[in-house]
Amino acid sequence: MSTPSKKRLIRDFKRLSTDPPGGISGAPCADNLMIWNAVIFGPADTPFEDGTFKLVLTFDESYPNKPPTVKFLSKMFHPNVYANGELCLDILQNRWSPTYDVAAILTSIQSLLHDPNPNSPANAEAASLYRENMKEYVRRVKATVEASWLDDGEMPESIEEDDEAEAEAEAEATVDRSAPQTASA
């Protein structure tokens, strides 16, 4: 049975597949629509340029009324990323809005790579270096970028492009078989 959160995630996936913002990609796991794998490419003209950073987004049935949990799987050195990969990002906390979709979340994270907020640090060392020793901060970030190229951390199996049509058809069939349709945000 398809729930409002799953219907919304299907819509988010269709949008992300047909009109992806530059430098990001994401898809639900093949066996669980509520867990997504994503990749953010480091923004140009930043120390993160050329990096390939893996993330996992975990949704629950309260989405889109509550934000997903988002965590970098790739090692990060950033003022707003905790050692465990979780983010300190206002839209994932007190500034969340149900109008945000997966593309908006990933774009916001990419923007955070471009413009860190050292005044709200999750990583005090990175924030301190960002403010006081940019040369060392950049050196540490570039080491993270290089590590992202070698990152062979396994991510759960995602829907591949060839399987997208099949997954969409299956998802739509689930939606079509569900109880009476109601409009949802």
UniProtKB/Swiss-Prot annotation:
Pathway: Protein modification; protein ubiquitination
Single GO cellular component term: Rad6-Rad18 complex
KW Methyltransferase (keyword) present: no
UniProt-annotated stretches for the region Disordered: 149-185
EC number annotated for this UniProt entry: 2.3.2.23
Domain UBC core: 4-150
Gene Ontology molecular functions: ATP binding; proteasome binding; single-stranded DNA binding; single-stranded DNA helicase activity; ubiquitin conjugating enzyme activity
Catalytic residues of the enzyme: C88
Keyword DNA repair recorded: yes
Catalytic activity reported: S-ubiquitinyl-[E1 ubiquitin-activating enzyme]-L-cysteine + [E2 ubiquitin-conjugating enzyme]-L-cysteine = [E1 ubiquitin-activating enzyme]-L-cysteine + S-ubiquitinyl-[E2 ubiquitin-conjugating enzyme]-L-cysteine
Domain of life: Eukaryota
Biological process, per Gene Ontology: cellular response to unfolded protein; cytoplasm protein quality control by the ubiquitin-proteasome system; DNA repair; DNA-templated transcription termination; double-strand break repair via homologous recombination; ERAD pathway; error-free postreplication DNA repair; error-free translesion synthesis
Acidic residues biased stretches: 149-173
Pfam annotation, one family: UQ_con
Keyword tags: ATP-binding, Chromatin regulator, Cytoplasm, DNA damage, DNA repair, Nucleotide-binding, Nucleus, Sporulation, Transcription, Transcription regulation, Transferase, Ubl conjugation pathway
Xref: InterPro entries: Ub_conjugating_enzyme (IPR050113), UBQ-conjugat_E2_core (IPR000608), UBQ-conjugating_AS (IPR023313), UBQ-conjugating_enzyme/RWD (IPR016135)
Compartment list: Cytoplasm; Nucleus
Free-text function comment from the UniProt entry: Catalyzes the covalent attachment of ubiquitin to other proteins. Plays a role in transcription regulation by catalyzing the monoubiquitination of histone H2B to form H2BK123ub1. H2BK123ub1 gives a specific tag for epigenetic transcriptional activation and is also a prerequisite for H3K4me and H3K79me formation. Also involved in postreplication repair of UV-damaged DNA, in N-end rule-dependent protein degradation and in sporulation.
Family: Belongs to the ubiquitin-conjugating enzyme family.
Protein name: Ubiquitin-conjugating enzyme E2 2
Protein's organism: Mycosarcoma maydis (Corn smut fungus)
Gene responsible for this protein: UBC2
